């Protein structure tokens, strides 16, 4: 049951959509209520024996819930009244609004008794639960699953919830209370700790490394370790060690100096020997070159002297071997010189500088290329968006019906409902359909997480009159009977509501804008019924909604 934005709280069968504070007289039939006075038999369904919900009366005078009477008609070819076994004729079944008003005004106890001792009329029961201080509510803090009464929620959020956030006393960051101790001891950079060397000083975690570099209790090697001193002691004791072991340190330095001088002397001798050998090899090479020229002259005069050629070849091989030996000696000399020469290091530094310059130039080129890539990506995204719009438009045109009936396939139900719960896309529209080729243009609008009084508990379904190309030729206001349906994919229990437009409502006048204000049912079907696995309203994450317009007495242009 829903109420109009213009209705000011008076009940009616079908009313205009109200996204604000709508007033509703209805109740959830699946709840077991505790009535203040014993429930009279005339208020019980003749089929399910529970309190009547949207009562319908048959020709034999018995009353049934709307859902029950539909079930009897769908499950049986010839429905029989379970009380008097009379045949139930469809044309004799009607809504018993008088009984409905009486049922909705029956008093029931709040289910949160004994904490709450309120007595409310059945039609206002859900509204009472929305305000009842003893109603269990969900804590708004993520991961908190503790049940909380509405009256205790404020204190729970501010003082007792283990998943509320509080500022760390040291780094001032917001931290979940249950993680606060672990944050302080292991993660907080500003948490004060004792020096690990037990110097009794309290320092911040971020300053530990800096403190250890000067801590008097830190273990440190003697500065003369390079010269052979093996002493390791606390920093505060090393100065005393340096004074007391001064003579020993001087002896170690002198011994090291003597060793270095001996090594330098040996290197000089080795270099002199290598230079002498290089000189000898150079003279041998000159001699061989001279012999080579002589053999070349002989070979030029007479090429038939094979022995001379063989000797010449052997000399060539010997010359190549000598050149290799000279090359090895030169490498050894260079290695010895490099130990006392910084030129290779300077050359390496110059090479690194050149590579750094090259990398900087590459960075500039990469920045230019990245900017161009971003521009191309922007253009591509614009084209993709336009293609998506065109594709959506073609789909709508292909699926348009002109017989006053719409079958709306809603796919990805879970994802779209989650978007509605998060507030990203609270409602979705169907493709438009027409009563004829030149008839009224219409569509449906659904709130998967509910709208108005159905928010959070029901799927809300509305009927929308849209602006069409032939509106100036049509009769206004729109007067045709409309039926909204949720199709059972097993073909057994379709849920439907039918209403006749109010000619005085602006929802059915000729549209001034793209569409009129929607009209329909904010509590069309409860989530508990829609999403129940025993029912077949949702299969493969898809549901089907149907809107049918009665075309009787409607003139076709």
Swiss-Prot record:
GO CC annotations, alphabetized: CD40 receptor complex; centrosome; cytoplasm; cytoplasmic side of plasma membrane; cytosol
UniProt key word Mitochondrion: no
Zinc finger regions, TRAF-type: 127-181, 182-239
MATH domain sequence ranges: 403-549
Domains: entry comment: The MATH/TRAF domain binds to receptor cytoplasmic domains.
Family the UniProt entry places it in: Belongs to the TNF receptor-associated factor family. A subfamily.
Name of the protein in question: TNF receptor-associated factor 5
Organism for this UniProt entry: Homo sapiens
Lineage: Eukaryota, Metazoa, Chordata, Craniata, Vertebrata
